[in-house]
Amino acid sequence: IGTLGVEVKIDKKAKTLHIIDNGVGMTAEEVKKYINDVAFSGAEEFLEKYKETSKDTGIIGHFGLGFYSSFMVADKVEIITKSYKDEPAAHWTCDGSPEYNIKKSEKNNRGTEIILHISKDSKDYLEENKITELLNKYNKFMPHPIKFGTKEETIQSKEGEKEEKIIVDNIINNPNPAWTKPPSELKDEDYKKFYRELYPFQFDDPLFHIHLNVDYPFNLTGVLYF
């Protein structure tokens, strides 16, 4: 499959938010099965139940609420996907009602793109600061890199030369946090660096840390700071 990743894009002119991956994708039949047949059974009730309270409770982004929570902020959602299987790509469109449209797509590369057509009362989801906040809050340690725009970095290519500024991908998350690595591979400075990543506004270093790496009678990994 190769290196997997996700990219998030904002198109303010079109008022759309794009989430793109290069995963295994879906066939048209899989879209019908997993997006329509399964999800529609509880989608209408879910949307009606949380329509008024979603902003106050911060319900967007909570685990397990599913794909259809996107209609809380979007008037229309599109899925353009191509499976790793040798089958045509599919383009699914829905406005949140039980009606949907699915047709073939010209997409050639494997993966899925979800396009949210952001509603008028949810324009803040077209702001970079808002999306950055959400990505950091809910996807900070996802196992695959998440790109959101670009950023400028300063490098010094050779000794004695002037610093040079380059544009690189802005990777929001840390796919390999400290707790996923064996303690033998980490130094004290690595733990302190990870602590600063977790708590950027905490200026004092922790007194000490405990790296949990248990595999019996259950699996448990983590880092405790004190």
Task: Give, region by region, the residue ranges found by the protein language model.
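GHKL (Bergerat-fold) ATPase N-terminal catalytic module, capturing the glycine-rich phosphate-binding loop
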Residues: 1-125, 133, 140, 153
